[in-house]
Swiss-Prot record:
Protein name: Isopentenyl-diphosphate delta-isomerase
Keywords: Cytoplasm, Flavoprotein, FMN, Isomerase, Isoprene biosynthesis, Magnesium, Metal-binding, NADP
Keyword field contains Isomerase: yes
Binding residues annotated for Mg(2+), in chain numbering: E155
Principal subcellular localization: cytoplasm
Length: 349
């Protein structure tokens, strides 16, 4: 594939993603908090700091991996980096493969560090990159963490995608053992299972982003790029973010879990934190805001999102993220069926 074709693909991904709409039905709507009328705390008591063994985020919300690798996406990364700088959010760039192949493309990613020199930035590579390239991706952005995206459904629907996956787990193990910053194994909208969590724990993984279905749909994106558009029947493939978080429950004491995929509102973010996530990521909402409304409007959107999270936590009488994990939740019969059929041990305060 030529550099021009790769740039074109990056732009196509963004164009199709922006045209997608939120799923009409979300598993976040299938779980409810129990309301108690009189809180014992004030809004100013709320501490939204997200603390993991290696990373401290001011807020448990981050701009998730999206793009880079073309002039248009450079402009997007530049604007998102300014939003991150002005709001204190962490930010992940999209796959840096384009920059690792062609130094001319490096600036489409490094612009994020240039615009946000003191901020928390995650670099991003695929599960098949050599260890040396993973190290290079971290150095490229002076990144505080490295996301490794695992995206087999996307690759298989992508006309020019990868068809070989046997080496992925061993390669991830090698990267985890060599890279000095936290390595986050990140799905891309298809969710995670307890079996995967077991496999990742065995090779020393300490961070995952479950990225469940319901947000940006890479099966749909790649199917749009197919000549016959003949794989749309896979559109609903995978686990939702709620199901994925429930799948991780037994591993949350050993692995820091981040949640993304279909988060629409501050309430969805709070529900994710209540299910054990340490932080929540969003891609398309930030992309649409910054492209359609500009930087200032997106900064205001983030500030409002954070304030709404504080209001919800006050209603729940939860001073911090840890408190949220003890709050009572009522699940729908469908989610309870998933828990039962998957033999998940869900214990709450």
């Amino acid at each position: 594939m030529s550099d021009f074709q790769r740039e074109q693909r990056k732009n196509e991904h963004v164009e199709i993603a922006m045209a997608q709409s939120d799923a009409m039905h979300s598993d976040f709507d299938k779980m409810r908090f129990v309301h108690h009328s009189i809180p014992s705390i004030n809004v100013n008591d709320i501490d939204l700091t997200s603390q993991t063994p290696d990373l401290t985020m001011t807020y448990p919300v981050y701009i998730n991996a999206m793009t880079g690798g073309s002039e248009w996406t450079k402009n997007i990364n530049e604007k998102l980096a300014v939003v991150a700088r002005e709001t204190g959010l962490a930010m992940a760039v999209g796959s840096t493969h384009a920059a690792l192949r062609n130094p001319r493309m490096a600036e489409t990613f490094t612009i994020a560090r240039k615009m946000n020199p003191e901020g928390m930035i995650f670099s991003n590579v695929g599960a098949d990159v050599p260890v040396e390239k993973a190290l290079e991706a971290v150095e490229l952005l002076e990144a505080q963490a490295l996301q490794i995206h695992v995206n087999s459904p996307q690759e298989l629907v992508m006309p020019e995608g990868n068809r070989e996956f046997v080496t992925w787990l061993d390669n991830i193990a090698s990267i985890v053992s060599r890279v000095s910053v936290p390595v986050i194994i990140k799905e891309v909208g298809f969710g995670m299972s307890k079996e995967l969590m077991h496999d990742l724990q065995q090779i020393g993984v300490k961070y995952v982003d479950v990225s469940g279905k319901g947000g940006t749909n890479f099966v749909d994106i790649e199917n749009e790029r197919r000549a016959n558009k003949d794989m749309d029947y896979l559109s609903s493939w995978g686990q939702s973010t709620v199901e994925s978080l429930l799948e991780t429950t037994a591993y949350q004491s050993e692995i820091s879990v981040f949640a993304s995929g279909g988060l629409r509102t501050p309430l969805d973010a709070i529900k994710s934190l209540a299910l054990g996530a340490k932080a929540t990521g969003m891609s398309r909402p930030f992309l649409n805001q910054v492209e359609n409304n500009g930087i200032a409007h997106t900064v205001a959107y983030v500030e409002s999102f954070i304030e709404h999270m504080k209001s919800i936590m006050t209603m729940l009488d939860a001073k911090n993220i840890d408190d949220l994990t003890q709050k009572q939740i009522v699940f729908s019969p469908e989610i309870l069926s998933w828990i039962e059929q998957r033999s998940l041990n869900i214990h709450r305060g």
